[in-house]
Protein backbone atom coordinates (compact mmCIF):
# COMPACT_ATOMS: atom_id res chain seq x y z
CA UNK A 1 0.00 0.00 0.00
CA UNK A 2 1.45 3.34 -1.08
CA UNK A 3 0.58 6.22 1.22
CA UNK A 4 1.89 9.51 2.55
CA UNK A 5 1.41 11.72 5.57
CA UNK A 6 -1.62 14.01 5.29
CA UNK A 7 0.66 17.00 5.76
CA UNK A 8 3.13 15.95 3.08
CA UNK A 9 2.60 18.96 0.83
CA UNK A 10 2.71 21.29 3.82
CA UNK A 11 6.08 19.93 4.85
CA UNK A 12 7.38 19.83 1.27
CA UNK A 13 6.60 23.47 0.59
CA UNK A 14 7.91 24.56 4.00
CA UNK A 15 11.13 22.65 3.35
CA UNK A 16 11.49 24.14 -0.12
CA UNK A 17 11.12 27.65 1.28
CA UNK A 18 13.36 26.97 4.27
CA UNK A 19 10.56 27.54 6.76
CA UNK A 20 11.36 26.28 10.25
CA UNK A 21 8.76 28.22 12.21
CA UNK A 22 5.11 27.37 12.93
CA UNK A 23 3.81 24.81 10.42
CA UNK A 24 0.57 22.86 10.68
CA UNK A 25 -1.98 20.98 8.59
CA UNK A 26 -5.72 21.21 9.25
CA UNK A 27 -8.08 18.49 8.06
CA UNK A 28 -11.78 19.24 8.53
CA UNK A 29 -13.01 17.97 5.16
CA UNK A 30 -14.44 20.70 2.92
CA UNK A 31 -13.91 23.49 5.47
CA UNK A 32 -10.17 22.77 5.88
CA UNK A 33 -8.83 25.74 3.95
CA UNK A 34 -11.35 28.13 5.53
CA UNK A 35 -10.25 26.99 8.97
CA UNK A 36 -6.59 27.43 8.01
CA UNK A 37 -7.35 31.01 6.98
CA UNK A 38 -9.09 31.64 10.29
CA UNK A 39 -6.28 30.08 12.30
CA UNK A 40 -3.68 32.21 10.56
CA UNK A 41 -5.70 35.39 11.09
CA UNK A 42 -6.26 34.65 14.77
CA UNK A 43 -2.60 33.88 15.40
CA UNK A 44 -1.62 37.16 13.77
CA UNK A 45 -4.29 38.98 15.78
CA UNK A 46 -2.81 37.61 18.99
CA UNK A 47 0.74 38.52 17.87
CA UNK A 48 1.91 34.94 17.59
CA UNK A 49 2.78 35.45 13.92
CA UNK A 50 3.72 38.37 11.68
CA UNK A 51 2.47 36.69 8.52
CA UNK A 52 0.86 33.44 7.47
CA UNK A 53 0.45 31.48 4.25
CA UNK A 54 -3.04 30.03 4.50
CA UNK A 55 -5.14 27.91 2.17
CA UNK A 56 -5.38 24.36 0.98
CA UNK A 57 -4.69 21.76 -1.67
CA UNK A 58 -6.46 18.54 -2.57
CA UNK A 59 -6.19 15.99 -5.36
CA UNK A 60 -8.46 13.36 -6.83
CA UNK A 61 -7.91 9.68 -6.21
CA UNK A 62 -10.04 6.56 -6.56
CA UNK A 63 -10.64 6.39 -2.83
CA UNK A 64 -12.27 9.83 -2.88
CA UNK A 65 -14.21 9.12 -6.05
CA UNK A 66 -15.51 5.80 -4.77
CA UNK A 67 -16.40 7.32 -1.42
CA UNK A 68 -18.62 10.00 -2.92
CA UNK A 69 -20.06 7.48 -5.35
CA UNK A 70 -21.08 5.26 -2.42
CA UNK A 71 -22.95 8.23 -0.95
CA UNK A 72 -24.80 8.54 -4.27
CA UNK A 73 -24.13 12.27 -4.52
CA UNK A 74 -22.08 12.38 -7.73
CA UNK A 75 -23.75 13.90 -10.77
CA UNK A 76 -23.06 11.89 -13.92
CA UNK A 77 -23.36 15.07 -15.98
CA UNK A 78 -22.55 18.70 -15.18
CA UNK A 79 -23.47 19.71 -11.63
CA UNK A 80 -26.27 22.25 -11.22
CA UNK A 81 -25.91 24.17 -7.93
CA UNK A 82 -29.19 25.47 -6.50
CA UNK A 83 -31.17 24.10 -9.44
CA UNK A 84 -34.34 22.13 -8.88
CA UNK A 85 -32.98 19.23 -10.96
CA UNK A 86 -29.65 18.99 -9.13
CA UNK A 87 -28.56 15.44 -8.35
CA UNK A 88 -25.02 15.77 -7.02
CA UNK A 89 -21.57 17.26 -7.28
CA UNK A 90 -18.65 17.09 -9.68
CA UNK A 91 -15.30 16.49 -7.99
CA UNK A 92 -12.35 18.73 -8.75
CA UNK A 93 -8.78 19.18 -7.59
CA UNK A 94 -6.56 22.17 -7.07
CA UNK A 95 -5.05 24.58 -4.59
CA UNK A 96 -5.32 28.19 -3.51
CA UNK A 97 -3.51 30.30 -0.93
CA UNK A 98 -3.68 33.72 0.65
CA UNK A 99 -0.78 35.35 2.44
CA UNK A 100 -1.99 37.26 5.48
CA UNK A 101 0.10 39.91 7.17
CA UNK A 102 -0.27 42.04 10.28
CA UNK A 103 -0.98 45.73 9.94
CA UNK A 104 2.28 46.68 11.63
CA UNK A 105 4.43 44.66 9.25
CA UNK A 106 2.57 45.52 6.05
CA UNK A 107 4.96 46.36 3.22
CA UNK A 108 3.03 45.96 -0.04
CA UNK A 109 -0.20 47.30 -1.53
CA UNK A 110 -2.98 44.77 -0.79
CA UNK A 111 -6.44 43.85 -2.05
CA UNK A 112 -8.76 43.96 0.96
CA UNK A 113 -9.20 42.87 4.57
CA UNK A 114 -10.45 39.70 6.15
CA UNK A 115 -13.10 41.48 8.20
CA UNK A 116 -14.93 38.53 9.76
CA UNK A 117 -14.93 34.78 10.14
CA UNK A 118 -16.63 32.03 12.11
CA UNK A 119 -16.68 28.25 12.48
CA UNK A 120 -19.54 26.20 13.91
CA UNK A 121 -20.07 22.51 14.49
CA UNK A 122 -23.70 21.48 14.26
CA UNK A 123 -22.99 17.71 14.38
CA UNK A 124 -26.34 16.97 12.73
CA UNK A 125 -25.09 14.00 10.70
CA UNK A 126 -21.78 12.45 9.71
CA UNK A 127 -22.18 13.43 6.06
CA UNK A 128 -25.37 15.50 5.85
CA UNK A 129 -26.53 19.02 6.69
CA UNK A 130 -29.55 19.84 8.84
CA UNK A 131 -32.70 20.54 6.79
CA UNK A 132 -33.10 23.90 8.55
CA UNK A 133 -29.51 24.91 7.79
CA UNK A 134 -28.59 25.41 11.44
CA UNK A 135 -24.82 25.13 11.00
CA UNK A 136 -24.73 27.35 7.93
CA UNK A 137 -26.99 29.88 9.65
CA UNK A 138 -24.70 30.07 12.68
CA UNK A 139 -21.44 30.31 10.74
CA UNK A 140 -22.75 33.05 8.45
CA UNK A 141 -24.44 34.97 11.27
CA UNK A 142 -21.35 34.89 13.47
CA UNK A 143 -19.00 35.85 10.63
CA UNK A 144 -21.19 38.84 9.80
CA UNK A 145 -21.42 39.83 13.47
CA UNK A 146 -17.65 39.59 13.93
CA UNK A 147 -17.12 41.96 11.00
CA UNK A 148 -19.30 44.65 12.55
CA UNK A 149 -21.44 45.12 9.44
CA UNK A 150 -25.11 44.37 8.89
CA UNK A 151 -26.38 41.59 6.57
CA UNK A 152 -27.82 44.16 4.16
CA UNK A 153 -24.31 45.51 3.50
CA UNK A 154 -23.12 42.27 1.89
CA UNK A 155 -22.79 42.69 -1.88
CA UNK A 156 -22.08 39.12 -2.96
CA UNK A 157 -22.11 35.63 -1.47
CA UNK A 158 -19.84 32.88 -2.72
CA UNK A 159 -22.05 30.01 -1.58
CA UNK A 160 -20.80 26.52 -0.77
CA UNK A 161 -23.24 25.31 -3.44
CA UNK A 162 -22.09 21.76 -4.12
CA UNK A 163 -25.09 20.79 -6.23
CA UNK A 164 -26.22 18.00 -3.91
CA UNK A 165 -29.91 17.95 -2.96
CA UNK A 166 -29.21 18.16 0.77
CA UNK A 167 -26.48 20.81 0.85
CA UNK A 168 -28.15 23.33 -1.43
CA UNK A 169 -31.51 23.03 0.31
CA UNK A 170 -29.87 23.45 3.72
CA UNK A 171 -27.71 26.39 2.67
CA UNK A 172 -30.69 27.99 0.95
CA UNK A 173 -32.75 27.74 4.13
CA UNK A 174 -29.93 29.40 6.07
CA UNK A 175 -29.76 32.23 3.54
CA UNK A 176 -33.49 32.83 3.88
CA UNK A 177 -33.25 32.81 7.68
CA UNK A 178 -30.57 35.51 7.62
CA UNK A 179 -31.58 37.69 4.68
CA UNK A 180 -35.29 36.97 4.30
CA UNK A 181 -36.58 38.18 0.95
CA UNK A 182 -33.47 40.29 0.37
CA UNK A 183 -30.78 37.70 -0.29
CA UNK A 184 -27.74 39.39 -1.89
CA UNK A 185 -26.50 38.24 -5.31
CA UNK A 186 -24.95 34.80 -4.92
CA UNK A 187 -23.45 32.01 -6.97
CA UNK A 188 -21.42 28.82 -6.73
CA UNK A 189 -18.17 28.58 -8.68
CA UNK A 190 -18.16 24.81 -8.21
CA UNK A 191 -19.98 24.46 -11.51
CA UNK A 192 -16.74 25.79 -13.04
CA UNK A 193 -14.04 24.12 -10.96
CA UNK A 194 -15.83 21.21 -9.31
CA UNK A 195 -15.80 20.58 -5.59
CA UNK A 196 -12.13 20.62 -4.63
CA UNK A 197 -12.86 19.48 -1.05
CA UNK A 198 -10.04 20.50 1.30
CA UNK A 199 -8.80 23.06 -1.23
CA UNK A 200 -12.20 24.62 -1.91
CA UNK A 201 -12.04 27.69 0.31
CA UNK A 202 -8.42 28.33 -0.58
CA UNK A 203 -9.47 28.67 -4.21
CA UNK A 204 -12.80 30.33 -3.48
CA UNK A 205 -11.22 32.86 -1.13
CA UNK A 206 -9.15 33.93 -4.12
CA UNK A 207 -12.34 34.28 -6.17
CA UNK A 208 -13.89 36.30 -3.35
CA UNK A 209 -10.94 38.67 -3.07
CA UNK A 210 -10.85 39.16 -6.83
CA UNK A 211 -14.58 39.88 -6.75
CA UNK A 212 -13.79 42.91 -4.58
CA UNK A 213 -10.68 43.92 -6.50
CA UNK A 214 -12.17 43.59 -9.99
CA UNK A 215 -15.85 44.31 -9.26
CA UNK A 216 -17.02 40.88 -10.40
CA UNK A 217 -19.96 38.62 -9.61
CA UNK A 218 -19.44 35.15 -11.07
CA UNK A 219 -22.19 33.23 -12.86
CA UNK A 220 -23.78 30.09 -11.46
CA UNK A 221 -23.55 27.71 -14.42
CA UNK A 222 -26.26 25.24 -15.47
CA UNK A 223 -29.07 26.87 -13.50
CA UNK A 224 -32.53 26.80 -15.09
CA UNK A 225 -35.18 26.29 -12.40
CA UNK A 226 -35.34 27.42 -8.77
CA UNK A 227 -35.61 24.77 -6.07
CA UNK A 228 -39.06 24.84 -4.46
CA UNK A 229 -37.76 24.84 -0.88
CA UNK A 230 -36.58 28.44 -1.06
CA UNK A 231 -37.20 29.79 -4.56
CA UNK A 232 -33.70 31.26 -4.58
CA UNK A 233 -32.26 32.27 -7.95
CA UNK A 234 -28.46 32.66 -8.22
CA UNK A 235 -26.67 34.97 -10.61
CA UNK A 236 -26.46 33.26 -14.00
CA UNK A 237 -24.34 35.73 -15.96
CA UNK A 238 -21.00 37.38 -15.34
CA UNK A 239 -21.45 40.82 -13.76
CA UNK A 240 -18.56 43.22 -14.29
CA UNK A 241 -17.81 46.70 -13.02
CA UNK A 242 -19.95 46.20 -9.91
CA UNK A 243 -18.93 48.05 -6.72
CA UNK A 244 -18.26 45.13 -4.37
CA UNK A 245 -17.42 46.08 -0.79
CA UNK A 246 -18.25 42.96 1.22
CA UNK A 247 -18.12 39.31 0.09
CA UNK A 248 -19.28 36.41 2.26
CA UNK A 249 -17.75 33.03 1.38
CA UNK A 250 -19.03 29.70 2.73
CA UNK A 251 -17.38 26.31 3.19
CA UNK A 252 -19.27 23.49 4.86
CA UNK A 253 -17.65 20.18 5.74
CA UNK A 254 -18.79 16.69 6.68
CA UNK A 255 -19.84 16.31 10.28
CA UNK A 256 -21.34 19.80 10.27
CA UNK A 257 -18.00 21.63 10.43
CA UNK A 258 -19.21 24.87 8.83
CA UNK A 259 -17.09 27.96 8.21
CA UNK A 260 -17.77 31.39 6.72
CA UNK A 261 -15.31 34.16 5.84
CA UNK A 262 -16.07 37.80 5.14
CA UNK A 263 -13.78 39.85 2.90
CA UNK A 264 -14.21 43.63 2.86
CA UNK A 265 -12.88 46.87 1.48
CA UNK A 266 -11.57 49.09 4.26
CA UNK A 267 -12.37 52.79 3.74
CA UNK A 268 -9.22 54.15 5.35
CA UNK A 269 -6.87 51.70 3.70
CA UNK A 270 -8.67 51.92 0.38
CA UNK A 271 -7.70 55.59 0.29
CA UNK A 272 -4.09 54.68 1.00
CA UNK A 273 -4.29 51.51 -1.16
CA UNK A 274 -3.20 49.46 1.85
CA UNK A 275 -5.68 47.00 3.31
CA UNK A 276 -5.27 43.95 5.51
CA UNK A 277 -3.08 41.46 3.65
CA UNK A 278 0.33 41.12 2.08
CA UNK A 279 -0.13 38.77 -0.86
CA UNK A 280 -2.68 36.66 -2.69
CA UNK A 281 -1.56 33.50 -4.41
CA UNK A 282 -3.68 31.05 -6.38
CA UNK A 283 -2.91 28.01 -8.44
CA UNK A 284 -4.68 25.03 -9.89
CA UNK A 285 -2.40 22.04 -9.50
CA UNK A 286 -2.35 18.27 -9.41
CA UNK A 287 -1.06 17.70 -5.92
CA UNK A 288 -2.35 16.33 -2.63
CA UNK A 289 -2.45 17.88 0.84
CA UNK A 290 -4.30 20.44 2.94
CA UNK A 291 -3.64 23.90 4.45
CA UNK A 292 -0.56 25.29 6.12
CA UNK A 293 0.48 28.51 7.80
CA UNK A 294 3.86 29.99 8.64
CA UNK A 295 5.68 32.68 10.59
CA UNK A 296 7.78 35.64 9.33
CA UNK A 297 7.11 38.18 6.65
CA UNK A 298 6.84 36.57 3.21
CA UNK A 299 7.80 38.62 0.17
CA UNK A 300 6.22 38.12 -3.23
CA UNK A 301 9.43 36.86 -4.76
CA UNK A 302 9.54 34.02 -2.21
CA UNK A 303 5.84 33.23 -2.59
CA UNK A 304 6.39 32.73 -6.32
CA UNK A 305 8.62 29.76 -5.52
CA UNK A 306 5.62 27.80 -4.26
CA UNK A 307 4.24 27.54 -7.75
CA UNK A 308 7.42 26.08 -9.24
CA UNK A 309 6.71 22.87 -7.34
CA UNK A 310 3.65 21.97 -9.36
CA UNK A 311 3.59 23.74 -12.74
CA UNK A 312 0.52 25.90 -12.04
CA UNK A 313 -2.02 26.69 -14.70
CA UNK A 314 -3.15 29.86 -12.92
CA UNK A 315 -0.93 32.16 -10.91
CA UNK A 316 -1.99 35.37 -9.17
CA UNK A 317 0.33 37.48 -7.04
CA UNK A 318 -0.61 40.69 -5.18
CA UNK A 319 -0.49 42.18 -1.62
CA UNK A 320 -2.87 42.15 1.46
CA UNK A 321 -3.09 42.00 5.55
CA UNK A 322 -5.41 40.23 8.33
CA UNK A 323 -8.03 41.54 10.68
CA UNK A 324 -9.46 41.66 14.16
CA UNK A 325 -10.55 38.51 15.90
CA UNK A 326 -14.25 37.95 16.55
Name each model-derived stretch.
Residues 98-102, 176, 235, 262-266:
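Short beta-strand-to-turn element immediately C-terminal to the catalytic PLP-Schiff-base lysine
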Residues 13, 33, 40, 68, ...:
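Conserved small-residue
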Residues 7-9, 132-148, 174, 178, ...:
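Short, well-ordered amphipathic alpha-helical segments that serve as non-catalytic structural scaffolds
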Residues 316-325:
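Short, intrinsically disordered C-terminal tails of secreted or membrane-associated proteins
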Residues 74, 78-147, 156:
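Condensing-enzyme catalytic core mediating Claisen C-C bond formation in acyl metabolism
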Residues 1-39, 64-66, 70-91, 172-202:
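Conserved catalytic cysteine-centered active-site region
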Residues 48-70, 75-86, 117-131, 159-168, ...:
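Acyl-CoA/ACP chain-elongation machinery
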Amino acid sequence: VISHDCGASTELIASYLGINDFITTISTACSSAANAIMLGARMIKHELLDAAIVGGTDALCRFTLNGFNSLMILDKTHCRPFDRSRTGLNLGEGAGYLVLQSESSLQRTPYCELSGYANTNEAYHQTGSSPEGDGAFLSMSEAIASSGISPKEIDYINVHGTGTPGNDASEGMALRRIFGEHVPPFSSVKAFIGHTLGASEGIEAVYSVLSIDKGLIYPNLNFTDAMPETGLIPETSLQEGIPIRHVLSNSFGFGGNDSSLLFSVNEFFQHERTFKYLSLCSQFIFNASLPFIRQRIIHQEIIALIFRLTNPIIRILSPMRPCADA
